[in-house]
């Protein structure tokens, strides 16, 4: 099960009813943060989201409405008692920006691992942390993070998160591979173990792969040819909808953003299950006023609001 909370749905500048861009994902008690605009900390407190268990922070690009909440958040995480490493993923330039932030944060009790312009990252989700791993054909990860270069006025990344579902234990397979019973539980947890000089792997006791959960996130950008394939069959697609009306198309083109309808068209092409719009222009008082026109293109579309949640479950 994956819990998703929109912490901030505004673009450009914070508004009384909308903080700036941020989303938090919670999987098995471990958290991933997508962007960190102003107000992120406040929204996390309002929504009861803990700070200490944030393991990965994904930044789309380096415009202020997506990163200005980060220095304060990193400080608060340090004050929460966290000592485990945190991964920060972002576009070219993210390392320099973070190093600048660290001038004001010289005593963080944890290490920041900055992954610049990276893709196809594999992670294991453990009870105490999420950990980057190098895989081989015998061990599968719990989480894959893929990135896609977008079309914005600053280097910008879209993100796709694929959460694998644990395979069922296969007794016949374990017996066929002559795996000692005392190792079964460890192998079911995807651990590599040895006994009497013999190595045993999880594939020796587990059945076929089952359908996992996919969440995709793209902001800020114009529509591109690569986005539909990147978001294909996502259970949830969170996408910018900076402008609600097609009358603002000239602004969308000039500022390299999207209208609601353009986002809906991407969702339709990508065959996603649900489109959740975010990153609304300060000129939009009520995004829901513009939803119906976009629903002519893609029906299962909603205008997100701060604090809105989704729960994505594994399905057989």
From Swiss-Prot:
Highest taxon in the source lineage: Bacteria
Enzyme class: hydrolase
UniProt-listed Pfam families: Lactamase_B (PF00753), Lactamase_B_2 (PF12706)
Binding sites annotated in the UniProt record for Zn(2+) 2: 65-66, 220, 279
Documented EC number(s): 3.1.26.11
Keyword GTP-binding: no
GO molecular function: 3'-tRNA processing endoribonuclease activity; zinc ion binding
Catalytic activity of the protein: Endonucleolytic cleavage of RNA, removing extra 3' nucleotides from tRNA precursor, generating 3' termini of tRNAs. A 3'-hydroxy group is left at the tRNA terminus and a 5'-phosphoryl group is left at the trailer molecule
Cofactor note: Binds 2 Zn(2+) ions.
Catalytic residue positions: 65
Keywords: Endonuclease, Hydrolase, Metal-binding, Nuclease, tRNA processing, Zinc
Cofactor: Zn(2+)
Keyword Translocase: no
Residues that, per the record, bind Zn(2+) 1: 61, 63, 152, 220
Protein family membership: Belongs to the RNase Z family.
Function: Zinc phosphodiesterase, which displays some tRNA 3'-processing endonuclease activity. Probably involved in tRNA maturation, by removing a 3'-trailer from precursor tRNA.
Subunit structure: Homodimer.
PANTHER family named in the record: ZINC PHOSPHODIESTERASE ELAC PROTEIN 1
Protein name: Ribonuclease Z
Organism classification: Bacteria, Bacillati, Bacillota, Clostridia, Eubacteriales
Gene assigned in the entry: rnz
């Amino acid at each position: 099960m994956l819990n998703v909370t929109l912490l901030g749905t505004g673009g450009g500048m914070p508004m009384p009813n909308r903080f700036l861009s941020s989303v938090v994902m919670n999987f098995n008690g471990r958290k991933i943060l997508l962007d960190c605009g102003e107000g992120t900390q406040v929204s996390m407190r309002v929504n009861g989201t803990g700070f200490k268990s944030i393991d990965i922070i994904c930044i789309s690009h380096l415009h202020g409405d997506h990163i200005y909440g980060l220095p304060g958040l990193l400080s608060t995480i340090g004050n929460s008692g966290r000592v485990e490493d945190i991964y920060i993923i972002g576009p070219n330039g993210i390392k320099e920006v973070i190093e600048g932030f660290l001038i004001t944060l010289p005593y963080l009790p944890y290490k920041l691992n900055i992954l610049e312009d990276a893709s196809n990252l594999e992670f294991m989700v453990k009870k105490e942390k999420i950990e980057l791993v190098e895989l081989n054909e015998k061990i599968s990860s719990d989480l894959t993070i893929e990135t896609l270069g977008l079309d914005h006025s600053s280097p910008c990344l879209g993100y796709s998160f694929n959460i694998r579902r644990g395979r069922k234990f296969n007794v016949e397979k374990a017996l066929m591979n002559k795996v000692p019973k005392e190792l079964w539980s460890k192998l079911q947890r995807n651990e590599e173990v040895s006994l009497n000089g013999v190595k045993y792997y999880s594939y020796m006791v587990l059945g076929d792969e089952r359908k996992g959960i996919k969440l995709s996130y793209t902001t800020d950008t114009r529509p591109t040819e690569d986005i539909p394939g990147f978001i294909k069959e996502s259970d949830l697609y969170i996408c910018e909808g900076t402008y609600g009306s097609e009358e603002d198309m000239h602004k969308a083109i000039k500022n390299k953003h999207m209208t609601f309808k353009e986002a809906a068209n991407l969702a339709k092409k990508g065959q996603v299950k649900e489109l959740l719009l975010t990153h609304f222009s300060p000129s939009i008082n009520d995004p829901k006023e513009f939803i119906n026109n976009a629903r002519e293109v893609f029906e299962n579309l909603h205008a997100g609001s701060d604090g809105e949640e989704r729960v994505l479950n594994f399905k057989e």
